[in-house]
Amino acid sequence: MADAEDIQPLVCDNGTGMVKAGFAGDDARAVFPSIVGRPRHTGVMVGMGQKDAYVGDEAQSKRGILTLKYPIEHGIVSNWDDMEKIWHHTFYNELRVAPEEHPVLLTEAPLNPKANREKMTQIMFETFNVPAMYVAIQAVLSLYASGRTTGIVLDSGDGVSHTVPIYEGYALPHAILRLDLAGRDLTESLMKILTERGYMFTTSAEREIVRDIKEKLAYVALDYEQELETAKSSSSIEKNYELPDGQVITIGAERFRCPEVLFQPSMIGMEAAGIHETTYNSIMKCDVDIRKDLYGNIVLSGGTTMFPGIADRMSKEITALAPSSMKIKVVAPPERKYSVWIGGSILASLSTFQQMWISKAEYDERGPSIVHRKCF
């Protein structure tokens, strides 16, 4: 192995919906959906080079003939064989690197089962033979990326949302709250709403179309009830969307009904507090002396916080819950879709971080449980 100096660490943010990967200090050069697709039909033409599994963008482009599966559900890996395929694809096809030559930084949702990170550690060392690795908490990385050391991060991706209060660089584990409601649930809910209107979206491939509608057209209303009234009386919020077969559908109130679920989970029958209330509850679990700093640094992160209007609504809802004199600031960095990856890239490049890696030698000596001792 060459000098540790010239070896760039790899940063891989395995989201439920998207994998973001690249070299520390660079930009995330590989961003692709966390999908493994398998053909629904048997191949009849010889020499077509059909594969038994497709990963990422290739699976996405051939989705019409595939069954698409996401190996990560709610931030937890549910299918390790597929997950291995995704990592293999990341290293060898996307980044074109030999993983045995680079330390690898992986990310994980807080409050994940311990077995999940142990298995991640085991696969990295035993299947990919990495020289060193580390598992970091996603929300903490987002805070790094925003240049703060104190704040509360609301990280909402495709599979899981969580609020993580961090003070002077320390996450406060007792106050971390997790909400298994995120982008994928919003896509499901939009599929239902559109089905009610007579558009049939049922297959795993069609779900991807609905996800695209959601990402392009949905927004968060500042006042939901008022917006519903507006939607009834005028067509100002209606937008058209062209389906892949050329059919055009018009969507109106669905545009803000879909993300409203984040603030009112009861809309999809979930007995949980909305993201604003979860953030508030998380702050209230912290020491009274640090709450002011948390209220003033509410940082949004993850793809599901990309809806237009979400920061203003969040600010309005938390102002209503907090003490009246409290100064509330919701920060929505423009690059928040990738802020976990960016934070990982910053962290892995720090000279002070270099002694934090779990080395192959330590792994061989202690086994997968070493990950709990070395990674927060």
From Swiss-Prot:
One of its GO terms (molecular function) is ATP binding. Pfam families: Actin. SMART domains: ACTIN (SM00268). Transmembrane segments: none annotated. Its main location: cytoplasm. It is found in: Cytoplasm, Cytoskeleton. It catalyses: ATP + H2O = ADP + phosphate + H(+). Its EC number is 3.6.4.-. GO terms for cellular component: cytoplasm; cytoskeleton. Keywords: ATP-binding, Cytoplasm, Cytoskeleton, Hydrolase, Nucleotide-binding. CDD domains: ASKHA_NBD_actin. Actins are highly conserved proteins that are involved in various types of cell motility and are ubiquitously expressed in all eukaryotic cells. Belongs to the actin family. This is Actin-1. It comes from Pisum sativum (Garden pea).
